[in-house]
UniProtKB/Swiss-Prot annotation:
Signal sequence extent: 1-29
Name of the protein this chain belongs to: Altered inheritance of mitochondria protein 6
Gene field: AIM6
Entry's Gene Ontology molecular function annotations: phosphoric diester hydrolase activity
Keywords: Signal
GO biological process, one term: lipid metabolic process
UniProt xrefs under PANTHER family: ALTERED INHERITANCE OF MITOCHONDRIA PROTEIN 6
Family matches, as SUPFAM superfamilies: PLC-like phosphodiesterases
Family classification: Belongs to the AIM6 family.
Amino acid sequence: MIPFTAQYLLVCGYVILLGVILLERSGYSAFGLLEKRQDYFHNSHAIMLSSRQDLGVSGPALYELFEKHLLDAYRIPGRYPGGISTLYDTFSEYVFKGTSHENCSVETSAVAKLTRDVTPLPIHSHNDYWRDVPLLKGLAYGSVSTEADVWVHPHKDHPYNSSTDKLEDYVLAVGHDEDYIDPLRKTLEKLYTDPLQSLLEGVNCGKSNNSKTQKNGVFYTANHIPLFFYIDFKSDDNILTYKLLLEKYFTQLIQAGYLTYYDMDTGKIIQGQVTVIMTGNYPNNTDVLDNGKADGYFGDRKRYLLQDANLLELNEESAKMAVTASTSLSEILKMVGSSNLKVIMRGHLDKEEITAIKKYIDNAHSFDLKTRIWGVPSWPRKTMKRLWKQQIEDLNSDFLNVDDLKAAAMF
């Protein structure tokens, strides 16, 4: 028989446990350490997002602060109806809150909030659109290169006919697989071009397209460094994709003078704050690129969408309209008589492989192109980091193709 004192303590324990469960279900934090969860989030959210409020951290520290401390926010339904996610919406709202082109200051800009303490790194944010916070997370970790896979999708239900429809009838949805795209919420405009426009406007107060003053880029401490933006053409109709990019999605960035372009008169690449690079199923016929005109798509003797050349088939002609050259590790190893399996089993590139691969890298550099090797194994982690080091130190490649931003930033 249980003594009375033990029975009393047991009953008290059950009562306390029941109380904790009821508090959790009603939204209150266990043991009353925090106020009601939803109110706590809303109140702290309101404090963080008050006009021009600055949390005092930027870069990875800022992103990780939101990522860790918004865990309970996922339990709050409908915080941002129609938004991307609670994390994305809250983070981007903080970054852009209180910033505008009309009343802007570099010190209080979105760029300052996001990248004030960030050192730009030779990192390409691979499959960036898969990240919880596309574009902004990569910038916070110092990635100087990002990418978006785009699919043509009709605005509404009607037969697909690019010859009769208007451009406004279509959107470019962002995603790796067409079956999983979200053409309402996850478009190129919402995830990339609009945020880029806002970032750049906030640090280029009063600078017009015709201004001779050098415009600032997206990195606060290195405003001369451009962002490389790969657009991977996924849809079969690459001509419609190309037209949408120029006439809808990049129009404002072009008009503001932010895009890198190819000068048809001098044959040179003129650097801007954002360098847009076509990859995948993109058109390369000059009639398409220039819209059938002798003086360029917009009649200004400029081409704004540049190309990613094949690193393994590079020549003077293919390099002319390119700014980068890329290939996969498996393809370049095949060209030099090796394979991914051999490298993984060994844990690194050997001297013969390095010598043979470096010839391709050096060839690209002779055309003033930056290089990227994708498809580098991400496991074992030791092998991944060894290959990162060899790409930088031995091959002198320009961009590391990275999935794990935190690991690369700490590398």
